[in-house]
Amino acid sequence: VWATWCGPCIIEYPEFVKMQRMYGDRDFEFVSISADKLEQKDKALSMLKKKSSAVRNYIFSGKDSYALIEAMDPAWNGALPYTMLIEPEGKVAYKLQGSIKPLELRKMIAEHPKLGRYY
């Protein structure tokens, strides 16, 4: 989960695009959710184009951002960026509030038995 007004989100976003390119042929898909207000969708779309994002992107269209937070993770306090790795069956394998460490995350994906390996 990211937003155009979140500096760390903008900085780390290209890393996710890179990871999708690296692991896209495996059972891995990067999906982004913008926490920008729906009225700001053009700004969010512009940022995605600048970052060459060719992944599935959503913008939260609800009025209550707390509903998004509760749906994603009741333990999340709403600070951005927020990253989750979810296994194909829906189990959360990793979650982080704050900026990722790209190499650590890539290693975790590559070594995870359900995310980064070929069978």
Locate the predicted segments by residue.
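Short, internal strand/loop/helix patches
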Residues: L45-L80
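Short pre-active-site segment immediately N-terminal to redox-active cysteine/selenocysteine motifs
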Residues: V1-W5, K37, A79
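Short alpha-helical
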Residues: G7, L38-E39, I100
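Conserved redox-active cysteine motifs that mediate thiol-disulfide chemistry
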Residues: V1-K18
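Extracytoplasmic/secreted envelope proteins and their assembly/folding machinery
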Residues: Y13-Q20, S32, K41-L45, I69, ...
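Thiol-/selenol-based redox modules, centered on thioredoxin-like
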Residues: A79-Y119
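Sec-exported extracytoplasmic/periplasmic mature domains
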Residues: I11, K18-D25, K49-K50, R56, ...
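Thiol-based oxidoreductase modules, predominantly thioredoxin-like and allied folds used
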Residues: D27-K41, S53-K63
